[in-house]
Amino acid sequence: MAVPKKRTSMSKKRIRKNIWKKKTYFSIVHSYSLAKSRSFSSGNEHPKPKGFSGQQQQTNK
């Protein structure tokens, strides 16, 4: 006889979601560094991908 599945708890959902987010973040960082190393531009800084948390420059106004 078929038995309904148990509901996944919120904490398990959150843990799995965070693991997925970490994997995607590190793949973005890796692809960005690879693209940066292979670029043949003459000193032009390419824009960083959205969500990249590298060093931020401070502007004084």
UniProtKB/Swiss-Prot annotation:
Residues 37-61 are annotated as: Disordered. Belongs to the bacterial ribosomal protein bL32 family. Keywords: Chloroplast, Plastid, Ribonucleoprotein, Ribosomal protein. The keyword Isomerase does not apply. It comes from the Eukaryota. GO terms for molecular function: structural constituent of ribosome. This is Large ribosomal subunit protein bL32c. InterPro entries: Ribosomal_bL32, Ribosomal_bL32_plant/cyanobact, Ribosomal_zn-bd. It comes from Agrostis stolonifera (Creeping bentgrass). The keyword Protein biosynthesis does not apply. GO terms for biological process: translation. It is found in: Plastid, Chloroplast. GO terms for cellular component: chloroplast; large ribosomal subunit. The gene is rpl32.
